[in-house]
Structure formats: C-alpha cells, structure tokens
C-alpha cells in the first residue's frame, strides 16, 4: 500500500514538472500546447531539443500553408527615420480575419515595419523605387519570423505588397510626412486604412508638431473617396477652413498623399506642377 502511494506521488510530481516544462516552452515559442507537449515528449524533456523540433515543424507547416489563399489582414504605416528615407504602406495578409486580429500577427506586422524602415534608412529611400522587389526583399528578410507566425497561427501569413509615398518631383525639399491609421486594434500604425501625406515647409527650420502632421493624414483618410480639387475641400472637422487655408495657416504646402485601405487599390493625389 505504501509503495503504491509513493509511486502515485512520484507520477504526479513528474506530471507536474512536465506541465511546467510545457508552459515554459509555450511561453518561449508561442506554439500550441499540444505541439509543445508532443515535442517535449519526443525530446525526452530536453527544452533546447524540443525547440528545434518545433522550429522544424514550423517550417514544414509553413511550406504546406504557402499556397493557401490570404484574403484578410491589415495595412501597416512605415515612415523612415528622416524624410529622405521616404514612407510606404505594407499590406500584410492572413487566411482569416480571426488570425489577423491575433496578437502574434500584429507583432509580426511591427517586425516587418521595423525591417522595412531599416532598408529605407540604409538606402536613403532608394529601396522603394521598385515596390515589387522591395516586397520580395522584405519577405526574404522576414522569412524566419513569417514561418514562426504561420506555426503559431496555423494558417498562412505573407507580405502582399508595399506601396510607396511618392512626393511631387517639383516639391521634394523641406519635406515632412504625416501618417494616420484608422481601425487600429492594439498596435499603433497597424489598421484597416493608412494615410500618408508629404508636405513641404514654407518656412525653413520652423517646428511642425506631430499632431499637425497626424491631422493632415487623418483628413486624407477621411476624404479619400472625394472627387475634385482637394485644396478646396473643407478640412476634416472644420466647417469653415479649406485644406488649402489650413495648410497655409500651418506654413505647409501639399506635395502628395497615399491612402491604402486593406483589400482595395491605393488612392493617390499629387500636387500639380505650377504653370510657367
């Protein structure tokens, strides 16, 4: 009787220790509990070996999921560290809206933004000259992170496209970029619609607040489907001030705008070159 009690206690203790290992592995990898348990069992409780097994299985799962249709997701605002680095909108896709709302998907969007910003800064914005090639390059850089996300989400995830903000050629000096994201869940700059606006400072060295730049981005997101001359539209939130007057009041002139809603074609406005 005493022997049976001892072995039962030992079995319970071993089970508890094993579950602690499962919890630790899940915390480190974010893989499903069932996958963590199976990997630890196969690795005889060796944490490092179990992580290697999960990584290999994640790659295999990613390969299987690679051809799955991705029709849901979010758009991501990416503004370079300096105006010369440029700005762009990344479209990130998943198979379901449920997965796109997952915290791991959202964090992977942030990782993609950080990597693209590094490329933009390193090339002084030149990487955006070929958006398709930029998307491919970013996908290659993000390969391991995307495979890890696929393993956690259990469905495909990919970088669909990169849309660059292209300033008007005749208005490329003293540029500033405003950004606004609509439909954010819990990560800034990741949402359903992103608006980027390039403006030029009239007075050099004047400090333009981030709130002012965000406001102009918000206006173009709110009015992206409007027809006609943007300068004569009422500024979003104002019944008396037009966009042109609002910009003049803040010492700015419009260069270009880019609004991207997930799943739709981007809306672009570019300042016309003045007549000679």
Curated annotation (Swiss-Prot):
It is found in: Mitochondrion. Signal peptide: none annotated. GO terms for molecular function: translation elongation factor activity. The keyword Protein biosynthesis applies. GO terms for cellular component: mitochondrion. The keyword Mitochondrion applies. GO terms for biological process: mitochondrial translational elongation. InterPro entries: EF-Ts_dimer_sf (IPR036402), Transl_elong_EFTs/EF1B (IPR001816), Transl_elong_EFTs/EF1B_dimer (IPR014039), UBA-like_sf (IPR009060). It holds the Pfam family EF_TS. Keywords: Elongation factor, Mitochondrion, Protein biosynthesis. CDD domains: UBA_EF-Ts. It comes from the Eukaryota. HAMAP family: EF_Ts. Belongs to the EF-Ts family. Associates with the EF-Tu.GDP complex and induces the exchange of GDP to GTP. It remains bound to the aminoacyl-tRNA.EF-Tu.GTP complex up to the GTP hydrolysis stage on the ribosome. PANTHER family: ELONGATION FACTOR TS, ELONGATION FACTOR TS, MITOCHONDRIAL. This protein may be expected to contain an N-terminal transit peptide but none has been predicted. This is Elongation factor Ts, mitochondrial. It comes from Leishmania braziliensis.
């Amino acid at each position: 009787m005493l022997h049976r009690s001892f072995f039962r206690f030992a079995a319970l203790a071993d089970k508890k220790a094993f579950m602690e290992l499962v919890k630790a592995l899940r915390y480190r990898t974010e893989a499903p509990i069932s996958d963590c348990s199976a990997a630890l069992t196969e690795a005889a409780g060796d944490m490092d070996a179990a992580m290697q097994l999960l990584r290999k299985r994640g790659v295999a799962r990613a390969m299987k999921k690679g051809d799955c249709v991705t029709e849901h997701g979010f758009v991501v605002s990416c503004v370079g560290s300096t105006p010369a680095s440029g700005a762009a909108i990344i479209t990130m896709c998943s198979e379901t809206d449920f997965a796109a709302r997952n915290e791991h998907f959202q964090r992977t969007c942030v990782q993609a933004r950080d990597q693209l910003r590094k490329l933009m800064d390193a090339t002084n914005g030149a990487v955006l000259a070929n958006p398709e090639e930029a998307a491919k390059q970013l996908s290659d850089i993000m390969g391991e992170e995307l495979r890890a996300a696929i393993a956690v989400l259990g469905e495909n995830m990919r970088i669909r496209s990169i849309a660059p903000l292209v300033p008007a050629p005749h208005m490329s000096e003293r540029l500033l970029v405003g950004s606004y994201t609509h439909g954010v869940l819990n990560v800034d700059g990741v949402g359903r619609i992103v608006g980027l606006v390039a403006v030029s400072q009239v007075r050099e060295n004047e400090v333009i607040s981030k709130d002012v730049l965000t406001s102009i981005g918000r206006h173009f997101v709110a009015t992206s489907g409007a027809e006609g001359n943007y300068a004569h539209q009422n500024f979003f939130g104002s019944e008396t001030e037009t966009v042109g007057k609002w910009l003049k009041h803040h010492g700015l002139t419009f260069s270009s705008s880019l609004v991207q809603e997930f799943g739709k074609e981007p809306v672009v406005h570019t300042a016309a070159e003045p007549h000679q």
